[in-house]
Amino acid sequence: MTKDLNTLVSELPEIYQTIFGHPEWDGDAARDCNQRLDLITEQYDNLSRALGRPLNVLDLGCAQGFFSLSLASKGATIVGIDFQQENINVCRALAEENPDFAAEFRVGRIEEVIAALEEGEFDLAIGLSVFHHIVHLHGIDEVKRLLSRLADVTQAVILELAVKEEPFYWGVSQPDDPRELIEQCAFYRLIGEFDTHLSPVPRPMYLVSNHRVLINDFNQPFQHWQNQPYAGAGLAHKRSRRYFFGEDYVCKFFYYDMPHGILTAEESQRNKYELHNEIKFLTQPPAGFDAPAVLAHGENAQSGWLVMEKLPGRLLSDMLAAGEEIDREKILGSLLRSLAALEKQGFWHDDVRPWNVMVDARQHARLIDFGSIVTTPQDCSWPTNLVQSFFVFVNELFAENKSWNGFWRSAPVHPFNLPQPWSNWLYAVWQEPVERWNFVLLLALFEKKAKLPSAEQQRGATEQWIIAQETVLLELQSRVRNESAGSEALRGQIHTLEQQMAQLQSAQDAFVEKAQQQVEVSHELTWLGENMEQLAALLQTAQAHAQADVQPELPPETAELLQRLEAANREIHHLSNENQQLRQEIEKIHRSRSWRMTKGYRYLGLQIHLLRQYGFVQRCKHFIKRVLRFVFSFMRKHPQVKHTAVNGLHKLGLYQPAYRLYRRMNPLPHSQYQADAQILSQTELQVMHPELLPPEVYEIYLKLTKNK
C-alpha cells in the first residue's frame, strides 16, 4: 500500500462505518455499527455452530469493511464488495494491518457479483442498507430476482432494508413494504430495527434463507416448505402461514401482518391466538395425551413460530385424494379414543378434518393442529355442534367419488348414505337426545356397532326428507361456489386492467400538460426573436448614454423586454427541471410490471395502425429497410464478414448497386453546427447564444445583466 491509512481515510467520500481497530475515528463515523454487529455476530455464531465450522461470508456493499473484518476476527473467510475504490483502498489497508485475517476486498457491482455466484461458494451473505440503490436503478422486480438468487446459493442472508418513508430521492422507487423484496423467499424473519444518521425513520433487518429455518435456538435445514396447511387449501389464511418440514421436525411460522395490509385485525389475532394456544397446549399437554415434543418457539412484532417433533405418517386428506386404501376401522377407533380422552379432561378439537389427521404405517390416526384444541365444545365452522361435525368427517371418509364443493363442508351431516355397520353406529347416536351427545358416547357405540340394529329398517319419512334436501343443498352450494370463484377471478382481471389503464391515462395527461407548457414557451421565444432588432436598437441607445457617463434610464419598452426575457429564462429553467422529472416518471412506467404485461398488446395495436395508415406495400418496404439496416450494422461490427461480402459482390458485379443502396440508407453525416445552422435562423441563434450578438450590443447586454 503506497499511501498510509490516514491519507486513505481522508480521501473517503464519507466515514460511514466505524474504522476497524482504530477508535480514534469512532467519533467521525456516520453510524455506530456495534449494535448491528452484535446481532450479526449472533447469527454468524448460530450458523457456524450448526455447520460445525467457520463460515465463508460475502459482504455486499462492505463500505469501510467494519463488519467484514469483525467476522474475519472470528475465523470467517471474507470477500467484501463495494463499487467505490476509496472504500476498497481503506479495507485493503486494514486487512494488511491484520495479516492473520482471511479477508479479500474487491471493487464491483452487486448485480454482477450475484449473477456470477456459484452455489455453496458462500455460507452467509450480508447486504446492509445497499439494495435500495439497486431498486432505484433497476426496479423492484429485478431486486427480488437478485435476492432470490442470493438466497438460493447461500445458507443465509442478512439484509438491512431502507423504507419508502425516508425523505430521499430514492424513496419513491421503494416498495410500500420492504418485505415485498423478500416475500418470495422461503424463510424470512425480522431480527431488528435500527436508526440511521440520515433520518429518524428506522430500517428493519431481516434474516433470509431458502434452505434453513433460522431461529436463535434452532438452526436446521428443511426439506421442503409450503404456504398452505394442506393440498387444496387455496388461499387459506391468505398465505400468512408457512410450514417447513425437516427430517425430524415441523416448523409453523405465522405472520401477524403482511405486505399490502392484506390481513384484517381479526385474521391477525386468529394467527396469534392459534399459535399461542398450540404452544400452551404442547408445553403442558393433558396427562395421557400423546403430544409431539416442542423444540423451539418464540415471536416478535411481525411473526411467531413453533418448532415441534415431526409425527410419522401422512395426512389423511392426501391419502383420500390419492385414492389409497385406508383402514377406516383403525383410523376412526384411534381418533375417537384421542377425542374421548381430551373430552374427559375438558378439551375439544374444534377442527377435526381429514387434513388435521395424521395416519402412520399401522393405520393409527393422530390429531394435529393443536392450536385448534379449545376448552369450549364448539366447532370452528358449520355445523358448530362437535358431534354433528364429526358426522360430516365420517361421511368424508366414505365419499371418495363425490364432487361436492360446499361453502363449509363437502359431505352431508346425516348418516344414511354410509355402509353398514357405520350407518347403524351413527344412527344410534342420532336417536339419542342432543344433550347426551359427546365423544365418550360415540366411542362406546362405535365399539359395539356390529350389534346395533339396522339403520335402514328404522328409517322413516323424516329421514328420507333429510337425505333428499341435503343432497340438493350440497349440489347447489357447489354450483354457486364454482360460479362465484369464476366471477371473482374475472373481477380480479378487470380490476388489474383498470389499474393499468388508469396509469397509462395519467401518464398521457401529464405528457399533454407538459407539451402545452412547452408550446407556450415556444410562442414566447418566437415573439422575442421577432423583436430582437428593436432590442438591439434600444441597447445601442443605452450604450450612448453610458459613454456620456450618465446612468441610463431605460425606456419602458426596453424594461418590459428585459423583464419578459428574464421571465422566459426562468420558465425555460423550470421546464427543464420538470422535463427531467417527467423523464424519471416515464422510466418508472417503462420499468413497471403493467407496462411489460401490455407490451404485446401495444405492439400489435401499433402495427395495425401503421398498416392502415401506410398500406401493405409501404410496410413491406419498411420491413426490408429494417432487415438491411440490421445486416449493415452486423457487418460493421464484424469486419471479416464485411470483407467477405464485399469480395463476393465484386465478383458478381453487384458492388456498385449495393454501395448506392448502402449510401442511400446511410448518408454521410454533416457537422452538428451545420445542421443547427440550417435549422435555426440567425436571430434565433442570437437569442439562444448572446455571444453571437454584434460586439457593441453584446457589451451592452453584459452591462445590463451583470447584476442579475
Curated annotation (Swiss-Prot):
Enzyme class (EC, first level): transferase
List of residues binding ATP: P229, H237, R241, R242, Y243, K252, E274, E309, K310, L311, M358, D369
Coiled-coil portions: 485-594
Residue pairs linked by disulfide bridges in the UniProt entry: none
Membrane topology annotation: Peripheral membrane protein
Catalysed reactions, as listed in the record: 3-O-phospho-alpha-D-Man-(1->2)-alpha-D-Man-(1->2)-[alpha-D-Man-(1->3)-alpha-D-Man-(1->3)-alpha-D-Man-(1->2)-alpha-D-Man-(1->2)](n)-alpha-D-Man-(1->3)-alpha-D-Man-(1->3)-alpha-D-Man-(1->3)-alpha-D-GlcNAc-di-trans,octa-cis-undecaprenyl diphosphate + S-adenosyl-L-methionine = 3-O-methylphospho-alpha-D-Man-(1->2)-alpha-D-Man-(1->2)-[alpha-D-Man-(1->3)-alpha-D-Man-(1->3)-alpha-D-Man-(1->2)-alpha-D-Man-(1->2)](n)-alpha-D-Man-(1->3)-alpha-D-Man-(1->3)-alpha-D-Man-(1->3)-alpha-D-GlcNAc-di-trans,octa-cis-undecaprenyl diphosphate + S-adenosyl-L-homocysteine; alpha-D-Man-(1->2)-alpha-D-Man-(1->2)-[alpha-D-Man-(1->3)-alpha-D-Man-(1->3)-alpha-D-Man-(1->2)-alpha-D-Man-(1->2)](n)-alpha-D-Man-(1->3)-alpha-D-Man-(1->3)-alpha-D-Man-(1->3)-alpha-D-GlcNAc-di-trans,octa-cis-undecaprenyl diphosphate + ATP = 3-O-phospho-alpha-D-Man-(1->2)-alpha-D-Man-(1->2)-[alpha-D-Man-(1->3)-alpha-D-Man-(1->3)-alpha-D-Man-(1->2)-alpha-D-Man-(1->2)](n)-alpha-D-Man-(1->3)-alpha-D-Man-(1->3)-alpha-D-Man-(1->3)-alpha-D-GlcNAc-di-trans,octa-cis-undecaprenyl diphosphate + ADP + H(+)
EC number: 2.1.1.294, 2.7.1.181
Sequence segments annotated as region (Methyltransferase): 1-210
UniProtKB keywords: ATP-binding, Cell inner membrane, Cell membrane, Coiled coil, Kinase, Lipopolysaccharide biosynthesis, Membrane, Methyltransferase, Nucleotide-binding, S-adenosyl-L-methionine, Transferase
Residues annotated for S-adenosyl-L-methionine binding in this entry: 16-17, 36, 61, 82-87, 108-111, 128
Cell inner membrane is among the record's keywords: yes
SUPFAM superfamilies, per database record: Protein kinase-like (PK-like) (SSF56112), S-adenosyl-L-methionine-dependent methyltransferases (SSF53335)
Localization terms from the record: Cell inner membrane
Subunit description: Homotrimer in solution. Interacts with WbdA.
Entry remark concerning the domains of this protein: The N-terminal part contains the methyltransferase and kinase domains that are essential for chain termination and polymer export. The C-terminal region is required for targeting both WbdD and WbdA to the inner membrane.
Described function: Regulates the length of the LPS O-antigen polysaccharide chain. Stops the polymerization of the chain by phosphorylating and then methylating the phosphate on the terminal sugar. This terminal modification is essential for export of the O-antigen across the inner membrane. WbdD is also required for correct localization of the WbdA mannosyltransferase.
Family: Belongs to the WbdD family.
Name of the molecule in the record: O-antigen chain terminator bifunctional methyltransferase/kinase WbdD
Gene expressing this chain: wbdD
